[in-house]
């Protein structure tokens, strides 16, 4: 039996059985890449949370980002940011609003020792200008 061929025909209950099997380790003959397209947002979040909490399982959480709900991506990115980490792998999937929030926090604390250079390609023009103005203001006040 080829589980991947069955995926498009499974209902939510069947997909949840597969999710549970991936989490408890009893299901090893299907990959996350095969199943993620078919899952509901909550199931994707459940799998993401499981693998994020168990890095020893060797699953890169990057695989989840294209499939996660936009709000969930933003929440996770902002949570990691609050812990002092910028997850570069998430950047293409983070909303402009979440990035703007980070820029505002960064500008409000110019002495923050956090490297945000990797954000530049993902920021809109207004946020880049805001960063530039804050940098120039901080630089002139330091002199």
Model-derived regions: residue spans:
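General marker for long, soluble alpha-helical cores
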Residues: 1-143
């Amino acid at each position: 039996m080829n589980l991947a061929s069955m995926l498009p025909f499974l209902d939510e209950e069947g997909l949840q059985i597969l999710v549970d099997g991936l989490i408890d380790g009893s299901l090893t003959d299907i990959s996350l890449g095969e199943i993620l397209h078919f899952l509901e947002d909550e199931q994707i979040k459940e799998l993401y949370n499981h693998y994020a909490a168990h890095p020893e399982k060797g699953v890169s959480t990057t695989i989840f980002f294209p499939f996660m709900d936009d709000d969930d991506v933003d929440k996770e990115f902002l949570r990691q940011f609050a812990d002092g980490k910028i997850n570069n792998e998430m950047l293409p999937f983070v909303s402009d609003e979440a990035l703007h929030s980070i820029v505002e926090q960064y500008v409000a604390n110019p002495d923050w020792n956090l490297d945000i250079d990797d954000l530049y390609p993902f920021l809109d023009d207004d946020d880049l200008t805001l960063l530039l103005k804050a940098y120039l203001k901080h630089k002139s006040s330091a002199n």
